[in-house]
């Protein structure tokens, strides 16, 4: 075919003006040798199309059911540009045949493409794969999920600390009526996945759902799965640390913040009215190696000796020991902070 882009556009506009579908008219099939010589003398180079049969293409789609594409209403797809480069249509089919692809799963915006590609597959003697075209995802507010939304790219999600299984758990259930639950491994997720449960209505993708799932994945993550990364971050060895802090994590990187509470430096927060109470707490602090029982024993003694309870009993201790009002349970943190650092912080010293 020797038409220029401008010539093809003019043809398209004329067809639309006449109420006709903008389908390529196959004028190139009528070119004579003299016509071709004239075009090439003008410096034109040909582009190539795949000639469709004009017959309907029918297949059973795993999501959409029976699909019928009338190839007579389609333009013969361009497979090679005038500059010699190939379009996606033919190379993708060749790759699929060579790789013996059995299933092609993609968005519903490719349904028409599939009709043409099935004819190309058959023309090349390949086996037609099973097709599944799912509805396109929308943003949480119903807008188009564009590639231009960089914060939703897989690379950005990975770089921000999203666990792979958090995203996998969500994607595997989007578009179904099934509840989205955190799943720790692909084998379990695959076992419960059924393409037939995908609906035709567009699914909405909310990044906040990923955040919530990420937290739940971490909360349920066994120590063995977390151990290599904990070692890289310099966390204390053993499951006790992980079991004590994972319930406060949204991202794995949050472990670094908790390690800072343990290792310091921490600037103790001591309210003016709590100085005497913290002095009493220092006197009552169990000496020597602290254990997970030390916190409950210590606070019980303080409750009996000072009459404080609830927030007034616990918050001054947390703020003095960690500099924060919130965080992992103190029964887990106290033995990790250790006796010497606890003494210094109760005295208001940074450390």
Task: Say what each PLM segment does.
Residues 4-133, 138-145, 153, 178:
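Active-site cores that bind ATP or allylic diphosphates and position pyrophosphate for catalysis
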Residues 50, 210, 317:
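Conserved S/T- and glycine-rich ATP-binding loop of Class I adenylate-forming
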Residues 51-68, 99, 103-115, 168-174, ...:
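Charged, low-complexity, helix/coiled-coil-prone segments
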Residues 107, 157, 307:
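Short, charged/polar micro-motifs that form catalytic or ligand-binding hotspots
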Residues 124-268, 322-351:
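Catalytic adenosine-cofactor/nucleotide-binding cores of aminoacyl-tRNA synthetases and other
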């Amino acid at each position: 075919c020797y038409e220029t882009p401008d010539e093809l556009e003019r043809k398209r506009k004329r067809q639309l003006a006449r109420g006709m579908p903008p389908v390529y008219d196959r004028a190139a099939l009528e070119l004579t040798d003299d016509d071709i010589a004239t075009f090439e003398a003008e410096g034109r180079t040909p582009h190539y199309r795949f000639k469709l049969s004009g017959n309907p293409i029918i297949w059973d789609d795993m999501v959409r059911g029976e699909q019928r594409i009338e190839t007579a209403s389609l333009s013969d797809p361009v497979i090679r540009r005038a500059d010699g480069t190939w379009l996606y249509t033919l190379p993708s089919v060749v790759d699929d045949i060579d790789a013996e692809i059995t299933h092609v799963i993609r968005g519903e915006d490719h349904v028409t493409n599939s009709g043409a590609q099935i004819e190309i597959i058959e023309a090349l003697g390949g086996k037609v794969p099973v097709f599944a075209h799912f509805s396109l995802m929308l943003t949480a507010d119903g807008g188009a999920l564009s590639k231009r939304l960089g914060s939703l790219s897989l690379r950005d999600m990975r770089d921000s600390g999203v666990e792979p299984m958090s995203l996998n758990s969500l994607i595997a259930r989007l578009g179904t009526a099934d509840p989205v639950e955190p799943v720790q491994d692909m084998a379990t997720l695959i076992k419960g996945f059924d393409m037939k449960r995908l609906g035709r209505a567009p699914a909405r993708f909310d990044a906040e759902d990923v955040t919530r799932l990420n937290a739940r994945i971490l909360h349920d993550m066994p120590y063995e799965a977390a151990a290599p990364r904990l070692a890289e971050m310099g966390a204390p060895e053993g499951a006790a640390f992980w079991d004590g802090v994972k319930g406060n994590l949204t991202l794995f990187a949050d472990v670094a913040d908790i390690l800072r509470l343990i290792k310091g430096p921490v600037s103790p927060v001591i309210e003016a009215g709590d100085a005497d109470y913290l002095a009493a707490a220092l006197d009552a602090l169990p000496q020597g190696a602290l254990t997970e029982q030390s916190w409950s024993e210590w606070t019980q003694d303080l409750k009996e000796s000072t009459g404080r309870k609830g927030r007034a009993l616990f918050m001054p201790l947390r703020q003095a020991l960690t500099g924060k009002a919130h965080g992992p349970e103190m029964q887990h943190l106290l033995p990790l902070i250790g006796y010497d650092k606890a003494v210094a912080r109760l005295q208001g010293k940074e450390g």
